[in-house]
């Protein structure tokens, strides 16, 4: 929130007028300023929906803004109705309304483990009470503990749960840019599982304590992630696991690319 209601309202105005265009109360995921119309894919992305609802709830509570709280509750209802599903005895968060379940995906349901924004789920339960939220939290965490692909024992960005969990067809079988944020979401939610943190940190780390995207089949690094916004994720995990202080090099914020900049800000918050 940055304690800046005026800037938050500008972001919310853009979100409301440019992204909340679907009939189900969820946000379109792809907006391109270089083309007209700007929306190039009308499907939603459930991590984005969770983050929007979560931000609105925090802002509404912090600034006593009933409109934000009502919008947050409305979005939480839509998430629960359209994105939280039951399959194979689990409660799951599908990545989007279209394209991740049978009959369109015969190997569905498909999940993206990094879409579980664990810190947001209890807030959703306050907005729209349902025992399904707790089950979503618990089953997501149990899945993360069980998803150990390849020699580095890492989760895949995209996972098929039609039978035994496996990397989903049609996607790179990798611990990729999506999954890099998983340890950060876990730490921000206050989840205490040092064994899980250690496995993720060891699996995603290459030379010089640098995180990387990983080819799951071979265990070999694909892209080394030198930006401070990526490196800080490993540093946060080290702080949680062994009490190591964050290095000064990652405590200085100098934004570069959008995604690692957001990871760094969330790590420093």
Protein language model regions, located:
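Extended ligand-binding clefts on enzyme/binding-domain cores
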Residues: 46-47, 67-246, 251-261
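Active-site-adjacent structural elements in enzyme catalytic domains
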Residues: 10-17, 57-58, 70-78
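Amphipathic alpha-helical interaction segments
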Residues: 6, 19-22, 63, 86, ...
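Residues in the short coil linking paired helices within alpha-helical repeat scaffolds
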Residues: 4, 65-68
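N-terminal carbohydrate-binding/catalytic regions of secreted carbohydrate-active enzymes
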Residues: 1-49, 252, 256-259
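Second-shell loop/turn segments in exported
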Residues: 1, 39-43, 57, 61-64, ...
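Short glycine/serine- and small hydrophobic-enriched flexible loop segments
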Residues: 1, 51-61, 119-126, 184-188, ...
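Generic hydrophobic/packing signal
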Residues: 19, 31, 50, 56-63, ...
């Amino acid at each position: 929130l940055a304690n800046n209601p005026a800037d938050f309202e500008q972001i919310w105005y853009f979100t409301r007028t440019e992204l909340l265009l679907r009939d189900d109360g969820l946000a379109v995921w792809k907006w391109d300023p270089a083309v007209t119309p700007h929306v190039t894919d009308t499907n939603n992305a459930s991590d984005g929906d969770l983050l929007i609802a979560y931000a609105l709830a925090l802002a509404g509570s912090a600034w006593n803004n009933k409109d934000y709280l009502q919008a947050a509750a409305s979005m939480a209802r839509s998430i629960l109705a359209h994105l939280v599903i039951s399959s194979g005895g689990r409660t799951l968060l599908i990545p989007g309304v279209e394209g991740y379940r049978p009959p369109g995906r015969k190997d569905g349901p498909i999940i993206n483990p990094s879409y579980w924004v664990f810190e947001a789920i209890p807030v959703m339960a306050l907005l729209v009470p349902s025992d399904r939220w707790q089950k979503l939290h618990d089953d997501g965490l149990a899945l993360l503990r069980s998803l150990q692909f390849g020699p580095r024992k890492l989760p895949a960005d995209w996972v098929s749960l039609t039978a035994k969990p496996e990397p989903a067809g049609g996607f790179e079988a990798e611990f990729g840019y999506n999954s890099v944020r998983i340890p950060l979401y876990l730490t921000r939610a206050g989840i205490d599982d040092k064994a899980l943190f250690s496995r993720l940190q060891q699996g995603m780390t290459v030379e010089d304590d640098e995180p990387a995207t990983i080819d799951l089949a071979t265990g070999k690094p694909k892209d080394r992630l030198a930006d401070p916004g990526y490196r800080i994720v490993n540093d946060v995990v080290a702080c949680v696991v062994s009490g190591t202080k964050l290095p000064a090099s990652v405590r200085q914020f100098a934004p570069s690319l959008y995604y690692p900049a957001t990871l760094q800000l969330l790590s420093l918050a």
